[in-house]
């Protein structure tokens, strides 16, 4: 079977170019073979493919790539994977703009991406140890929230406050009761591809714990609030503006948390987010894994042209020749589909 691919999603952009490729390949194969497609199940299966290049991804990119609905915000929940589609407020345009720095999870900055996963696993283990529920197994943040009986991610923030900000691997090993560093690496930090999350691990290797989990749980709470705000829209103009004001606060707080607590932003992303706000975006945040790539923001429809022209000038001053490759206005689009010719 020979598949020929073509796409216009910039590589290293943080706009799910890798997920677009894997989702398209899988859907094409199933269509050609006349195999019935369950896109929810397919999203979970495709998400596992990134583990073959030693990146411990989640599954959100694949889920939305296959199941998005035009004009709707996709609220994605896991364990099990399920969707809730909610309409964006009227009069809003989505702006997407580049930091002019590539974000490549599988090369270079991959270390930071997998290290964040390791730091979260370590924090989860410490939370369970404190609660007397540690069983020497890998647990995700949602697992811990459920095991501790917290209905909302916000309920975890007080628990996180008791965690140390930083620990060396040796200190973590002693705290969790592993007999050796090797045992801990294999049991707590192994990857699906058979490797370990932390390259060149040594007893003195330091992990950041408190800030990472504070970001994860506060971000989960922001996502819940975003969903709630959209669900309670009444449709009148006063309510629309109030909704946008709440969205503005949530998205801006999200970028700040990504930058300060999770440290997945960078000076280039922070610069372009700040510039976008100067040019008319009322809210913006990085998208994708971070450490470069693109950011996404919202613009009032009546101000979209002015915003675009101002941002275009910014990129021209940066020496960008093909501005259409680094800046575009769009809307929530449809997920993957097949057309049989």
Mark where each language-model region is.
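A short glycine-rich, hydrophobically flanked beta-strand micro-motif that places a catalytic Asp/Glu
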Residues: 1-5, 269, 284
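C-terminal nucleotide
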Residues: 75-283, 297-341
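Short helix-coil transition sites and intra-membrane helix breaks within transmembrane domains
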Residues: 13-19, 261-263, 285
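FabD-like malonyl-/acyl-CoA
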Residues: 19-20, 294-298
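Gly/Ser-rich oxyanion-binding loop with an adjacent helix/lid
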Residues: 1-90, 98-103, 116, 129-130, ...
């Amino acid at each position: 079977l020979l598949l020929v691919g073509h796409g216009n999603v910039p590589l290293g952009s943080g706009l799910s170019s890798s997920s677009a490729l894997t989702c398209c390949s899988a859907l094409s194969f199933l269509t050609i073979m006349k195999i019935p497609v369950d896109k929810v199940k397919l999203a979970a299966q495709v998400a596992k493919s990134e583990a073959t290049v030693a990146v411990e991804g989640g599954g959100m990119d694949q889920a939305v790539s296959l199941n998005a609905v035009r004009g709707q915000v996709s609220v994605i929940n896991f364990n099990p994977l399920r969707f809730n589609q909610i309409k964006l407020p009227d009069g809003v345009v989505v702006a997407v703009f580049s930091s002019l720095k590539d974000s490549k999870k599988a090369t270079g900055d991959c270390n930071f991406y997998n290290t964040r996963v390791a730091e979260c696993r370590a924090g989860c283990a410490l939370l369970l140890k404190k609660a007397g529920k540690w069983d020497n197994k890998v647990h995700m943040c949602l697992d811990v929230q459920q095991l501790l009986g917290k209905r909302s991610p916000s309920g975890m923030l007080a628990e996180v406050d008791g965690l140390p900000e930083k620990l060396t691997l040796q200190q973590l090993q002693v705290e969790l009761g592993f007999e050796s560093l090797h045992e801990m690496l294999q049991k707590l930090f192994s990857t699906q591809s058979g490797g370990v999350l932390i390259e060149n691990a040594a007893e003195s290797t330091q992990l950041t714990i408190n800030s990472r989990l504070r970001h994860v749980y506060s971000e989960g709470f922001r996502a819940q609030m975003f969903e709630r705000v959209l669900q309670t829209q009444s449709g009148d103009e006063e309510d629309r503006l109030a909704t946008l004001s709440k969205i503005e606060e949530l998205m801006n707080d999200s970028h700040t948390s990504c930058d300060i607590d999770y440290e997945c932003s960078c000076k280039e992303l922070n610069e372009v987010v700040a510039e976008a706000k100067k040019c008319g975006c009322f809210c913006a945040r990085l998208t994708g894994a971070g450490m470069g790539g693109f950011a996404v923001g919202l613009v009032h429809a009546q101000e979209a042209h002015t915003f675009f022209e101002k941002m275009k000038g910014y990129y021209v001053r940066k020496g960008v020749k093909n501005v259409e490759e680094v800046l575009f206005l769009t809307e929530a689009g449809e997920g993957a589909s097949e057309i049989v010719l």
